[in-house]
Amino acid sequence: MDNAPALAAAADSSDPRTGLRAVAALRRLLEQLEALQVDNAREHGWSWQEIAELLGVSRQAVHKKYARRASAR
């Protein structure tokens, strides 16, 4: 996560190869952060609906994406 500022800067590169690589890396980082915070919210007793509202998605979408992960813990 320490490299997020460098990745954001690289995403603004005029070199498409550099920019696209940075965008892909930022996407992976974002997925990791989202999963971490969904786990955190569930551990704090949040409902799927509460999480979904803050992520701007449906309850079904967030449940489908993370329910298996949550039950594995």
Name every feature range the model reports, one short phrase each.
Residues 1-24:
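N-terminal acidic leader/helix
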